[in-house]
């Protein structure tokens, strides 16, 4: 009978992974590294997004301040006088204009971000006509002059203040004797126009065209492009008669017609023309997209886009816009401040990199004995570096991702790739700082490492060559900055060496201080030995045996100081130049002027205004 004996081997002990062990034994260190990387990644990712957002805000303010009259792309075309009268009349009606407007939108494509709600089409007069109605105001005895505008979308962009919206039948022609119209509330108030008023425009080989006002409208968005391309549509103005030595004034305003009433203008002396206004979508403009926008505007004004528009509408179409000039002015301003932004970015980035390197160096210094023991017991540099890399990566990568997410939430509406690259650079540096420092310090295997002594250390030749190279670069950057400034010409953005000048100066200053630091210690060490007591000699000995890596804190501090000082001096110079330019242009902090005599009590009223110290009254004849 056989007997079976079962032999069980003792269970082998499971060794905990390195990363988990390190995180459990030093949670405070891991938390500190995560916090440092998260904050640095947040700042690094927020910087390019903030630059983008400020650039977008500046561009939008530039476009808004330029006014719709300059930024709208306007296509114009005269009536087709060579066509038969029915076709010519039909080409000016609302349906034909809307069809052409749709064709223009298709022809221009998506090269320009357009605000379709504020875009419009219509017919308007070229020559404002003198009104003979005796009830119209005449400030200096001159009759008012009125334009006639038949623009699409009047009902959608206004609300009725009195009366009803004007209507037009579909059979209006150049011989139609009377049509309906409307005026804005400002026009009605200043020109004494009421519902039921009749205005007569001189005819050409026909009786005058009568326009009966059926409604008074109030603009829903007076500052929108719909009303601002031709401001006379909403607000009449007092205009000085050209060439009049007495500077007499007359009122100038506009009457609003329904689009289907446009053919009636062909029988008047107003010289009507068709137009299609494309308003840019200001909220969709981005500062980094200006070169592409300028190319699109140029193509629309006199390029392939204009050719497609002519094929879709009429060969007589022309395009005009000052949007390219507005974009060019903004681009010059952005180019001028680009080097200053680069200086700030280089300075801030250098400080952040130094702080991360300093954190890695401190961590390697605290674990010096541990890492020395690992190398002495057979640990390879590759294995040591890999373990440390995994240890820092498991903390730094999630922290950097958290900082990136926080930056995207804090600064919305900007490009993501640059923020991801900046946060990725922080994560990479946070992961590699400790492994690289440890590998560099423990290349050779040894149980004992020599104690650092600043007073006895002698810089190596490689360090001397590196320092001299940095010194040469710093001198070249400073000389270039002093001779030609931050940019080389009106279209330059400044080279990176010039932008690095404050950082290089800080690096050289830190290296010089580190070089000079041992000299007073050596000079004081020998006299201190003759002193009574142990405090003085021991203090000097302790200072002399300090770590030689003190260059990193010095570099961080000096870089921050030099960058801040450079930025402060630039801002101060810009403020002084702005004040000086304003003073030379205006002659004072503010100036009130008019072609006519100002009210006699205006000076006293201005003098009583808060913040006004003195008022000078002057007359120029």
What are these regions (language model features)?
Residues 367-374, 381, 436-456, 518, ...:
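Cytoplasmic membrane-interface regions of multi-pass membrane proteins
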Residues 1-350, 486-499, 512, 582-590:
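Membrane transport/envelope proteins' first extracytoplasmic loop
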Residues 403-463, 472-487, 514-515:
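C-terminal membrane-exit region of the final transmembrane helix in multipass inner-membrane proteins
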Residues 346-353, 414-434, 494-511:
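Alpha-helical transmembrane segments
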Residues 354-393, 453:
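Interfacial "coupling" helices/loops that link adjacent transmembrane helices in transporter permeases
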Residues 485-621:
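Juxtamembrane segments of multi-pass membrane proteins
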Residues 1-44, 452-470, 514-563:
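N-terminal Sec/SRP start-transfer signal
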